[in-house]
Amino acid sequence: NADGGDWLDAYTRQEDGFKAGDLLTVGGDNYLLVQRDHRENGVYSRFNAVRCNQTITLGKWVKSTEPNDFGEYLNIFTPYATTPAYMVTQLTGLNKTVIGSVLGGTVAVIMPAYPIDVNVPVKCHYIDSTMEFVEREFTVESMDCTDVNTDAEGNIGGILRLQIKLSP
């Protein structure tokens, strides 16, 4: 049920057990369930959902255990999670075509919750205006964990909101 742009209302059967932070695939697009509407009728749940417009990879830099040909121990990007996410620049609003070309400022990210620290490297993958596959690296500046939760088994769930900045 679309209400414009990248956002829509998603209705799920209550017995399906969907919750904020879950991903749904509809017609080849990934949608992130962001917020549950508590006006339910006992049969279905209604969520605000956003169409994911990027795939991001979370990782960490690890110093190589072996020197290169010049005797240097290089830092190697080691990914630990790849997920669909919704990214928006503060300058472009919902215009997702400009996200990859941000040269300054910050980018807001809404994504499923993962263990993450400030300053963790985030790689964004997209196809630019010339139809080339591009990867850019960002660094997490701040995060909002208000809607992140942990269940009895220690599994992290919910929605994580980040502010990221293009790495130098």
Regions found by a protein language model. Name each.
Residues 1-168:
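Short, conserved turn/kink motifs that form compact alpha/beta structural patches or helix kinks used as
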